[in-house]
């Protein structure tokens, strides 16, 4: 994370540990807190399941493979891959709330959910995936990130990175988002990713679905508004205004194509 190991845990504590009730009500059943794939989808649920299927197919998952899910969130992708593709999954998160719910979601499946910094991993996996986590790594740690992925990936393995990206190479940190939503976050550019991964990987596929984030964020906002009466006893009106602004501001950025995915 931008400032080292400690700052990554700040993100987990301040945002992802807000409460599983908030995210359960706002997100789809797989609790995907990243862009859905709306090509043939009519609902948020369909868009997120289509995204999960696309990820698993790009990874060419086969029964018996070992899959590492870096930044596994609430375990939606880990559970989907284990259930539908017969793979053995290790998911890592730095959020205690996410780990708790992910373990419950993956009960009975060949899935292990670890509360651990990804940099401490020393295993071998046939496939590695990371969805919506690279935004928290920071430019100073991009090379380390790809070093860790390469170290844990078996020869001839595949790695899929799914991240929001900026159209310019800079310290792409929004002051408001950094203060209120994602402390220490930073959006990578194409150049950032290409330079940091050089010497580690051959880029076989580049797929930009950033335009789909507009609909995803609007779906989250509608669900957040509908759920607010249930959430209001626990969260303040200030939080409601802040979170609504966050979802709508991000929608505007994707709609204007200022950022991509």
For each of these PLM feature ranges, what is it?
Residues 64-71:
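Conserved class I S-adenosyl-L-methionine
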Residues 1-26:
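N-terminal auxiliary segments of SAM/dcSAM-dependent transferases
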Residues 143-155:
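A short glycine-rich, Lys/Arg-flanked "PGG" loop and its adjoining helix->strand segment in the class I
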Residues 74-85:
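Conserved SAM-binding loop of SAM-dependent methyltransferases across substrates and taxa
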Residues 119-128:
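A short acidic, Gly/Pro-enriched loop at the edge of an enzyme's catalytic core
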Residues 108-118:
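Conserved SAM-binding strand-loop segment of SAM-dependent methyltransferases
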Residues 164-260:
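Substrate-binding/catalytic lobe of Class I Rossmann-like enzymes that use SAM or dcSAM, i.e.
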Residues 156-164:
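Conserved beta-strand signature within the Rossmann-like core of class I S-adenosyl-L-methionine
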């Amino acid at each position: 994370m931008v400032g080292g190991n400690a700052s990554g845990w700040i993100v987990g504590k301040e945002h992802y540990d807000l409460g599983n009730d908030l995210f359960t009500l706002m997100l789809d059943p797989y609790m995907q807190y990243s862009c859905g794939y709306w090509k043939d989808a009519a609902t948020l649920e369909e868009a997120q399941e289509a995204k999960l299927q696309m990820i698993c197919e790009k990874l060419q998952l086969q029964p018996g493979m070992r899959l590492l899910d870096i930044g596994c969130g609430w375990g939606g992708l880990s559970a989907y891959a284990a259930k539908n593709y017969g793979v053995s999954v290790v998911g890592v998160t730095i959020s205690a709330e996410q780990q708790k719910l992910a373990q419950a979601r993956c009960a009975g499946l060949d899935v292990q959910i670890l509360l651990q910094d990804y940099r401490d991993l020393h295993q071998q996996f046939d496939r590695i995936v990371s969805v919506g986590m690279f935004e928290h790594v920071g430019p100073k740690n991009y090379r380390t990130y790809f070093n860790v992925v390469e170290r844990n990936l078996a020869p001839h393995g595949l790695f899929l990175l799914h991240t929001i990206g900026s159209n310019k190479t800079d310290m792409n940190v929004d002051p408001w988002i950094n203060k209120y939503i994602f402390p220490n976050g930073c959006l990578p550019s194409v150049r950032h990713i290409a330079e940091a991964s050089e010497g580690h990987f051959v880029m076989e596929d580049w797929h930009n679905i950033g335009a789909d984030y507009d609909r995803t964020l609007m779906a989250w906002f509608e669900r957040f508004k509908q759920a607010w009466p249930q959430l209001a006893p626990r969260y303040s009106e200030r939080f409601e205004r802040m979170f609504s602004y966050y979802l709508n501001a991000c929608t505007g950025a994707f709609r204007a194509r200022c950022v991509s995915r």
